[in-house]
A protein has these predicted regions:
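Positively charged, small/polar-rich N-terminal and surface patches that mediate targeting and assembly
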Residues: 1-100
Length: 100
């Protein structure tokens, strides 16, 4: 079975709702979340401090999922978070597992 890694970058205002969606989703096999700084965001979406620093506070979430579940998970995210400023990219997972 082919696995993918969906990386999401979200603003702090939607972090908890996005994590809740993933926790309840049967399509998110495993995921992590990390505080990060996002660069290249639209200037209008930044507060004054972020404009001076040139970066926005954000959360990066990496989700491991089966390739067959990609469309369903992205649709669920789009449905709930349209216009919320989420960015994403998808990469193939060459190998994954648990160290036992």
């Amino acid at each position: 079975m082919s696995e993918l890694c969906l990386t999401l970058v979200c603003p702090p205002a939607v972090e908890e709702k996005l994590l809740d969606l993933l926790l309840l989703s049967p399509h998110a096999t495993f995921f992590t979340s990390t505080a990060t700084a996002a660069h290249g965001m639209a200037h209008d979406n930044l507060d004054q401090t972020e404009q001076v620093l040139g970066r926005a506070r954000a959360t990066e979430i990496q989700v491991i999922l089966d390739a067959a579940d990609k469309a369903a998970l992205l649709e669920a995210i789009r449905r709930q978070f349209a216009g919320a400023g989420l960015r994403y990219w998808m990469t193939a997972v060459a190998e994954a597992g648990e160290i036992a």
